[in-house]
Every structure is written in structure tokens, then in C-alpha cells.
Amino acid sequence: MQQFKWINILKGFAMGTSDLVPGVSGGTIALLLGIYNQFIASISGIFSRRFWPSFTFLIPIIIGMLLAMGSLSNLFNYLLSQHHIPTMFFFGGLIIGIVPYLLKISNYKTSFTTKHYMMVIAGIAILIVITLMNNGDKHAGETLTLSTSLIIKYFIAGMCASSAMLLPGISGSFMLLVFGVYGTVMLAISEVVKLNFAGLPILLAVGFGVLAGFIISSKIIQYFLTHHKLMTFALIIGFVVGSLFAVFPGLPTNIVMWFVSLVVFIIGFIVSLTLGRITAENE
């Protein structure tokens, strides 16, 4: 029987933290921490005979993700608005650092053929197209007003965001940006944390969409991981590489920003590369 693992709260916290940043995927962090396959299988199995082991695996991860989103939403609003370039350079370093781990676990040197490399290219292209779809202001002021059409929009946005969240390289928060609701959702989270529940209906609409997206997309991903593993990993590698296009904030504008951005980029790269090596050694 699957046991409740306290360490998974920390792993969930890391996943939740990454999902606050447009362009950075919680699925990427799950891969880096070595829990991606089990995470997908557990979500897929929550409405099956594997309910209890799936439930006990997911609960600490969900707790960690909620803690991260509740405690860090204001911080990330500040970092992304006031220190956008260094923040995104840090996450760019994290993303690049995971690529060697992905190449290693996919055993690409002996397993990949032309079709797999074409799938990598397709994954990169998909991320570039998704990035170009977003032309809105990531940090524009938002209100908490609601209408029937907006509730439907938030539900669909949540559904697409959770589906993206499960795929390494595609950020759930970035999909919220594509739908133009990222600022509103972040504001709603911040207000609910302050015990102002005016944003609760928005979070409920998004939350139900997230739940529906998790259930549907996890079963699809689980199927492809089981029956088309190499092609799936090739697509994932493409998504991760393509996500660099999404997180690239532009070049620093002065010497100090260049220095800070390069330092945090290197830190992110080293952290990701080290975690990838540790995970690979423990598999």
C-alpha cells in the first residue's frame, strides 16, 4: 500500500512554485524530482480500483502545491513585475539544466530515429506557436467581477491550464495568460489568502476546470507513456526546449542586470543539473 510521504509535500511545493511562473511547468519539476510517471499514474488512477494508493500519493503533493500558491503568489507577483528579467533567467537556467537528464532517461543515442527527432521539432514548434498566441499584458490590473460567460471562460481556462501543467514544458500559468485570465486568477488567490473571499467564485470556476482537465488529460498521457513511451519522451523534450522561447524575457538593459541575470541563470542551471543527476542515480 502506498504510504503518505512527507517529502512529497516539499516536492509538491516545488511544483506549485514553478506553476506560478508563466512558461515554467510543474510537470518539468516533477520529471526533475523523479515522480512524473507516478504522478500521472496516480491522477489517472484516482477514479479506479487504485484509488487509495493514488490518493495517498497525491495528497502530500497537492498540499505542497497549495501551500506554494497560497504563500508565494504575492512574492511572485512582485518578482515578475519588478524583477522580471532576472526571475525569468533563473527559470531559464532550471529548464536548460533538465535537458541532459531528459536525454539520459530517453536513451536517445541508441533509441531515437528520424521520427523521434521530428517529434522533438514538433514539440518545439508547438511551444513557439503557443507563446506567440499570447499578446496580453502579463501583469495588467484585473478585477474580480463575474458573469456567466466569464465563469465558462475561467472553467475552460482552468481545464486547459491543468492539462498543460501535466505536460513538461507547457506551463499551466502560461495557458492562463493565453486565455487572458492570469492576472485575475493571481489577484483572486492573493485576496482569498487575505480572507477577502470576493475572488472565491473565480477560484472555484478555475478549480473545477483544473479538476476536469487533470482527470481527462492524465488518462491520455498515461496511455501514451505506456504504449508510445519513446515518442512521448521525444515530444516532452521538444516541449521543454521550446519552453525556453516562452520564458525568455529579452536581454538585460544594463551591466548590473546582466550580472544578476547571469548569476541567477547559472544558479538555476546548477540546481536543475544536480537534481537531475541525483534523480538519475536513484532510478
From Swiss-Prot:
Pfam family, any one: VCA0040-like
Keywords: Cell membrane, Cell wall biogenesis/degradation, Membrane, Transmembrane, Transmembrane helix, Transport
This protein's GO CC annotations: plasma membrane
Main location: membrane
Record-linked InterPro entries: VCA0040-like (IPR007163)
Record membrane topology: Multi-pass membrane protein
Summary of activators and inhibitors of this protein: Active in alkaline conditions.
Null mutant phenotype: Mutant shows an alkaline growth defect, reduced peptidoglycan quantity, accumulation of the peptidoglycan precursor UDP-N-acetylmuramyl pentapeptide (UDP-M5) and decreased cross-linking. UndP recycling is impaired and mutant shows increased cell surface UndP levels. Deletion of the gene increases sensitivity to the amphomycin derivative MX2401, which binds UndP in the outer leaflet of the cytoplasmic membrane and prevents its recycling. Mutant is far more sensitive to amphomycin than the wild type in alkaline conditions, and is also moderately sensitized to tunicamycin and bacitracin.
Keyword Membrane applies: yes
GO-annotated biological processes: cell wall organization
Spans traversing the lipid bilayer: 27-47, 51-71, 85-105, 112-132, 148-168, 169-189, 197-217, 230-250, 255-275
Localization: Cell membrane
Family: Belongs to the PopT family.
PANTHER family hit by this protein: INTEGRAL MEMBRANE PROTEIN, POLYPRENYL-PHOSPHATE TRANSPORTER
Role of this protein: Flippase that catalyzes the transport of undecaprenyl phosphate (UndP) across the cytoplasmic membrane, from the external side to the cytoplasmic side. Is involved in UndP recycling during peptidoglycan synthesis. Necessary for peptidoglycan maintenance.
More about this protein: Is sufficient for resistance to a surface UndP-targeting antibiotic.
Name by which UniProt lists this protein: Polyprenyl-phosphate transporter
Species whose genome carries this gene: Staphylococcus aureus (strain NCTC 8325 / PS 47)
